[in-house]
Amino acid sequence: MWLQNLLFLGIVVYSLSAPTRSPITVTRPWKHVEAIKEALNLLDDMPVTLNEEVEVVSNEFSFKKLTCVQTRLKIFEQGLRGNFTKLKGALNMTASYYQTYCPPTPETDCETQVTTYADFIDSLKTFLTDIPFECKKPGQK
């Protein structure tokens, strides 16, 4: 009987001292990736029927040299109309990810221009397709 109690006590002590989670901590929240993919699917599925003019960042976006990321996300979010307002959450989540986990991008020379809504949506698709899912560390190529 005492052997059973000793074995039970050993199991309890061992289970209490065991790690409660994986020793590998996840440092990259990937919710923004799913949000970007969902936004791209919605953009592909919805026809552009508005003839409004909206503002976009006129500087060309390049994944090699990220500039105006927060400005672009803010302007895209503000420019959404109609059914496309469903994308606000995805853009907000992406902005939050980049603001929290990535080095700041230059935001000073972010000139804007007025364009058609169809061109605005095309610019948004291109931006979401080209934006890297993962941050580059300073000095990383």
From Swiss-Prot:
GO molecular function terms noted in the UniProt entry: cytokine activity; granulocyte macrophage colony-stimulating factor receptor binding; growth factor activity
Record-linked SUPFAM superfamilies: 4-helical cytokines (SSF47266)
GO-annotated biological processes: cell population proliferation; cell surface receptor signaling pathway via JAK-STAT; cellular response to granulocyte macrophage colony-stimulating factor stimulus; embryonic placenta development; granulocyte-macrophage colony-stimulating factor signaling pathway; immune response; macrophage differentiation; monocyte differentiation
InterPro entries the record matches: 4_helix_cytokine-like_core, GM_colony-stim-fac
Location in the cell: Secreted
Mutagenesis or variant effect for L80P: 450-fold reduction in bioactivity
GO cellular-component term (any): granulocyte macrophage colony-stimulating factor receptor complex
N-terminal signal peptide: 1-17
Residues that carry a glycan: S22, T27, N83, N92
PROSITE patterns cross-referenced by the UniProt entry: GM_CSF (PS00702)
Pfam families: GM_CSF (PF01109)
Alphabetic keyword roster: Cytokine, Disulfide bond, Glycoprotein, Growth factor, Secreted, Signal
Main localization (coarse): secreted
Disulphide bonds in the chain: C68-C110, C102-C135
Family statement drawn from the similarity comment of this UniProt entry: Belongs to the GM-CSF family.
Function, as annotated: Cytokine that stimulates the growth and differentiation of hematopoietic precursor cells from various lineages, including granulocytes, macrophages, eosinophils and erythrocytes.
Subunit and interaction comment: Monomer. The signaling GM-CSF receptor complex is a dodecamer of two head-to-head hexamers of two alpha, two beta, and two ligand subunits.
Protein name listed in UniProt: Granulocyte-macrophage colony-stimulating factor
Source species taxonomy: Eukaryota, Metazoa, Chordata, Craniata, Vertebrata
Gene behind the chain: Csf2
